[in-house]
C-alpha cells in the first residue's frame, strides 16, 4: 500500500474484471468536485443503458481536500413512478403485471447469440452518445498530452512551464475511459508533431491512444 496513490489501474476497469464481451462505463474524475458529480452521472448512465458504470479515481484524488458543491436533493420516486420509468425493475410482484426476472443466462445457442448481439448494439449506442473529454489549449498545439485523473492536473502545470519556454503544448483529458475518445485523438494525429501519455502506471492507456492514431504520429509514455 506504500505506493497505492500511483495505481491508475486503467486495465483493471477498462479491460479486465471478468470474462465475456462486456463493457463498463468508466468515469475518471480529476477533481473532488467531479468525484461527487460523477456519482450521480454514473447512476444516471447505468439506469439509462442498464449497464454497470464505475468511477476510476486514483489515490491522489481520493485523499485531496477541495470545496464541493453538492447537487440539490431529488424527490424519491413512488412505486408507480418506478414502474413507469423502469418497467424492468424488480419490486416484488405488483398487481397488474407479470413478474420481472432479470437474468443473462441463456442455454439455447440461438438465444445466446441474440443476447450477445443485443449487448454489442447497446455498447455501440453508448460509444456514439456518451464519449466525454476536455481539451485545454489544443487549438494550435504542436505537441499533445493525453492524461486522466490526477495526472491531468499535473499536466496543466506542465503546460504552463512549456508555455514559458515557447512550446505550444495541448492537453486532452479523457473523462470517459470507456467509451474512449478515440475519434478526437485520431484527429490530432494529423495536427501535432508528437503525443505524450503521462500515467501513474507502467503504461496502460497509451495502448488505446496508439490504436487511435494508428501509427500516424509518434506516441510516447511517461510513467512512475
Locate predicted features.
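Short coil/turn connectors at secondary-structure junctions
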Residues: 7-8, 20-24, 48-52, 139-143, ...
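Short, small-residue-biased leader/transition segments that mark boundaries at the very start
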Residues: 1-5
Amino acid at each position: 500500500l506504500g505506493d497505492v496513490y500511483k495505481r491508475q489501474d486503467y486495465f483493471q476497469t477498462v479491460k479486465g474484471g471478468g470474462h465475456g464481451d462486456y463493457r463498463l462505463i468508466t468515469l475518471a474524475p480529476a477533481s473532488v468536485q467531479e468525484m461527487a458529480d460523477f456519482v450521480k452521472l454514473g447512476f444516471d448512465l447505468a439506469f439509462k443503458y442498464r449497464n454497470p458504470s464505475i468511477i476510476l479515481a486514483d489515490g491522489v484524488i481520493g485523499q485531496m481536500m477541495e470545496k464541493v458543491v453538492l447537487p440539490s436533493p431529488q424527490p424519491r420516486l413512488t412505486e408507480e413512478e418506478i414502474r413507469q420509468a423502469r418497467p424492468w425493475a424488480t419490486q416484488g410482484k405488483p398487481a397488474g403485471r407479470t413478474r420481472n426476472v432479470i437474468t443473462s443466462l441463456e442455454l439455447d445457442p440461438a438465444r445466446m447469440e441474440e443476447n450477445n448481439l443485443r449487448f454489442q448494439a447497446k455498447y455501440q449506442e453508448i460509444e456514439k452518445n456518451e464519449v466525454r473529454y476536455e481539451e485545454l489549449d489544443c487549438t494550435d498545439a504542436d505537441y499533445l498530452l493525453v492524461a486522466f485523473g490526477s495526472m491531468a492536473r499535473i499536466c496543466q502545470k506542465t503546460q504552463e512551464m512549456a508555455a514559458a519556454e515557447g512550446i505550444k503544448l495541448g492537453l486532452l483529458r479523457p473523462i470517459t475511459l470507456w467509451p474512449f475518445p478515440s475519434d478526437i485523438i485520431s484527429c490530432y494525429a494529423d495536427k501535432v508533431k508528437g503525443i505524450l501519455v503521462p500515467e501513474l502506471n507502467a503504461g496502460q492507456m497509451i495502448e488505446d491512444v496508439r490504436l487511435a492514431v494508428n501509427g500516424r504520429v509518434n506516441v510516447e509514455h511517461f510513467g512512475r
